From Swiss-Prot:
Zn(2+) 2 binds at residue 175. Its EC number is 3.4.17.-. GO terms for molecular function: metal ion binding; peptidase activity. This is Probable carboxypeptidase ACLA_088580. Its cofactor is Zn(2+). Glycans are attached at residues 107, 156. One of its GO terms (cellular component) is extracellular region. Its main location: secreted. InterPro entries: ArgE/DapE_CS, Bact_exopeptidase_dim_dom, Peptidase_M20, Peptidase_M20_dimer, Peptidase_M20A.
Amino acid sequence: MRSLTLLLSLSTALRSVAAPHPASPQGQIPLGGIPSASTSEVGIGIGIGIEEDPFPPAAGSGHNDLEDVINASPLLSFHRDLVSIESISGHEARAAAFVADFLEAHNFTVVKQPVAGDRVNIFASPRAHAHSRPEILLTSHLDTVPPFIPYSLHRNDSRPTDRQLIRIAGRGAVDAKASVAAQIFAALDILHADPSAPLGLLFVVGEEVGGDGMKAFSHDPRLNPAPSRFHTVIFGEPTDFALVAGHKGMLGFEVLASGRPAHSGYPWLGRSAVSAILPALRRVDALGHIPVHHGGLPASHKYGRTTLNIGVLEGGVATNVVPAAARADVAVRLAAGSVDDARAIIAAAVADATHRDPAVVVDFSRHLEAYPPQDLDVDVPGFEITTVNYGTDVPNLHLHPRPDGPVKRYLYGPGSIFVAHGENEGLTVGALEEAVGGYKKLVQAALERTRA
């Protein structure tokens, strides 16, 4: 219901003013600042007005005008068509076929690398380079999280033609189909100006659920030979146009407790698994705040504290039964150190908190996939620099060593991680167009570095 209200909003148009990254937890030292929303998503003003969506769904003639904006742009219409295809993890086949057909129509040689069932990765290189191998790889992912949200357009009625205020919404509109579209059109622009540019494109499946697509690429000697053909890899994820200096590592584990069932009126006849697990979980929950020399998990200047999330807690069958089993599932975002060291710290902490109770154990067997913090390159000028706490396919791409030194790895993309995976996922027309320039800048820097 509409209501009169005092509207307060803060402009984020002052992008040049550095501010702590909104993803930074207490104690994390940001390497640079990016705002939590783009200038197209938050306006400035104070006054009495009608409270309503600043980006209402387009309707009537205005809707037709917005469709004309999209139809007039190959980039925007490609992005629209890709976002309109449902590609929840495990069901990426239609999206992969669409991207493959588009690239083949634009003079790319396309390899459809099998992953599982009808799921394929798309690896492409310019058809004119049939006898050479790409050296600069742009990569992102085709899958999205559920649920599917259809593509839609929204406008700000006060400035309906401002490309920074025309908002594109839908599942994957940001994560990561905006990166896919911007990378493809950056490559097309570069190849038009420099047909010899040794570019490759890789769009994988399964990034959101363990990275099986990128792992399949890594293990394919045809596409990923030794030594590595690539001297530069540019990963596409929502970074709000910042270059990411790295992201935290990740591991997971379960805490399992066993007890003995009994009638809850006579609890001394049994043993509560829930009561047994609680001291362990209290300690686990605090490990990111405990100094290492007191048995806690490490922190770093770059990434801040290690954080833990007890995401699942299960136990018991009824309130009148002493619970015979309890289980907790925990995710760790690791700020420093190795996975093995972190696992040892966690196991020791649980043992200490439970006085080495054999009925309470730590189990890492269901979370074998783990990785330490991932440091990335940020040596291209003209970008803000930050760190992020989310995971990516960076640790899933295993490249063979090159004789001339390590492979450069960059992480960049349009859109905010704070709307990715949410019901309001979206970005503006202007943001998507700006990202093409960002990817071109990264590619040009790689070309200049190697040709020099």
